[in-house]
């Protein structure tokens, strides 16, 4: 297959998948691995992750690695046919979701995805968590399904993330209008004991304790001016 024909076939995917195509999608379109390798050597494609290639003319986004990891979960299926709760896919979550929401400063370069069933990966940079998500738990960022700020905070509390880190994420999420304090308090009661709150199930007490650790409170945060986000 000549170069122009191969690129034309691949463009059906790259034009609608952030400039990327999986090797399985390429094979299904009639472009084999040998041709992909030849296109890569010729400078038409870059290898993003194992089994995922990007057209070199496509602009890379800040979340290209996450996009590539998500594509690989259901590598044969085009992105435009997948739903946010794709049973064969997953949702960006936990630390990765906080990063995509631009919340907090958690240091973890791994890509974390929540999947409805157990998954494994040979890629040490990809980590899976198994959980059942609801539609209200998921939003979209740059075309990717990502857990909402509320669900992300709940997941991080379940992981026992350091209280100051989680409090900062909560503060920034509230300031960005991604999270309501009253709604959060209703959902985080189950994590109160593990953070040392003496009243089991008291989400408001847990929230107050977390915020006190970074020098603020529910009342202060609810009434403070919202700083600009850049």
Annotate each PLM feature.
Residues 2-148, 152, 159-230:
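Short gly/ser-rich loop at a beta-strand->alpha-helix junction or flexible surface loop bordering the NTP-binding
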């Amino acid at each position: 297959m000549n170069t122009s024909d191969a690129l034309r076939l691949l463009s059906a995917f790259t034009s609608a998948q952030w400039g990327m195509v999986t090797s399985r999608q390429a094979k299904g379109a009639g472009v084999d691995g040998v041709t992909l390798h030849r296109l890569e050597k010729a400078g038409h494609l870059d290898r993003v992750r194992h089994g995922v290639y990007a057209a070199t003319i496509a602009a890379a986004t800040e979340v290209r690695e996450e996009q590539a990891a998500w594509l690989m979960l259901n590598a044969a299926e085009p992105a435009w046919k997948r739903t946010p709760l794709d049973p064969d896919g997953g949702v960006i979550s936990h630390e990765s979701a906080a990063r995509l929401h631009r919340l907090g400063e958690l240091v973890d370069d791994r890509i974390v995805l929540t999947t409805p069933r157990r998954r494994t990966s040979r890629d040490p940079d990809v980590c899976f968590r198994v959980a059942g998500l609801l539609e209200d738990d998921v939003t979209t960022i740059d075309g990717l399904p990502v857990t909402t700020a509320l669900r992300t905070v709940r997941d991080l509390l379940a992981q026992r993330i350091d209280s100051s880190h989680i409090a900062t994420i909560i503060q920034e999420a509230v300031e960005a209008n991604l999270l309501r304090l009253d709604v959060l308090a209703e959902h985080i009661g189950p994590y109160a004991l593990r953070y040392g709150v003496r009243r089991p199930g008291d989400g408001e007490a847990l929230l107050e304790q977390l915020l006190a650790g970074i020098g603020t409170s529910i009342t202060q945060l609810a009434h403070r001016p919202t700083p600009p986000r850049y």
